[in-house]
Amino acid sequence: SNTLVYGHTCVMTDFETSVYKALAYLIESGHNQIGLLVGQETTADNRPLQTDPRYMSFKHYLEEKELYQPDYIRVGHFSSDSGYDMMKELIDELGNRLPSAFFMASDALAVGALRALQEASIPVPDRVSLISFNDTSIAKHVYPPLSTVTVYTEEMGKQAIHSLLQDLQRGDSGIPTMHTLATRLTIRESTR
């Protein structure tokens, strides 16, 4: 998360561009009804920390395109169980009005949602396309393999270590900086 506001250097993913690319791909593929499953990080006493930047980017982009539908959005936790529960709820509530595509804020959410869709005999990607976020190892090992936003976590770690070493060499923390890394949209079999 963005620690720059607290006076600390941070290394982040470019969430906004990442979400915009994923949504643009879905829209170009003919999807006009796009849902979102996202987690909410909380403190130890269950107070929300901040609104997830993927949610904010999703909302902003689809509002600009006049495609934003709040009924298609669920906020839970960043877990496969939460993804399963949220998708099951949407299937039960929306039935045939279920969106033709979903953006998932994490691979774990997508794995749970995929299971709920499969249990309801809703074919992916023929009826519902999915794009997730992170490209963890599980994304390519589920069926169908998940289209996902690839986050370069190893490079993020290298950038963080480099910044820390620079601070140590200077003997102070210097001026805090923010390093934002790009992502790549990796298309697999969960979208069409």
PLM features per residue range, with description:
Residues 2-192:
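Bacterial carbohydrate/catabolite-sensing allosteric modules
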